Amino acid sequence: MLVMNSRIIGTPILSVQAGGPIATIKSAIIDPNDLKILGFHLEGPLVNRAEARILDVRSIREYSQLGMVIDNIEELVAPDDVIKIQNVLELNFDLINLKVRTKKGTKLGHIIDYTLTSEDFIVQQIIVRRPLVKSLVDPELTISRKEIVEITDYEVIIKDEEKVLKARAEKEDFVPNFVNPFREQGFAPAKTDDKKD
């Protein structure tokens, strides 16, 4: 299921052992190499003073409308407990507010949100707010991860806009691959006697 990052922020973390919420999600920890979420920074009275304030996504048993379910508070980790998470934290990387441009250098705007899959926590799309002039026609762009060519500390570079728009237009011009039995040869619409006086 695709979920907006903005909807995940503030999601309760539910502990089976405690029988209720122990924290809420503050922000995501994203690996810029593959746009996979490794964990979440948490906040709340039970975790604010503890060193272990990070939820590794591998500890999540279930994600539902109620929140993210884990076994117990012991599942939370400190920043230096998991080497991969520690390495990403040192990069201080965040997708939100990164500028987006094409390979040719056309500025498209900056990232205001993104979608991810709730099964594997991989970013699937970025939502880009357009510059003021372009926003009059199209205020936001939704760009698939397949269009991303490179990610730096300051910007996301995507395939040239013409290719992205062409691919989107082809997708919208999709014709279903089925035969309409009422359009077969030899079929004639029924005649009606609707004579107008």
Feature map (PLM): residue ranges:
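Peripheral interaction segments used for macromolecular assembly
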Residues: M1-D197
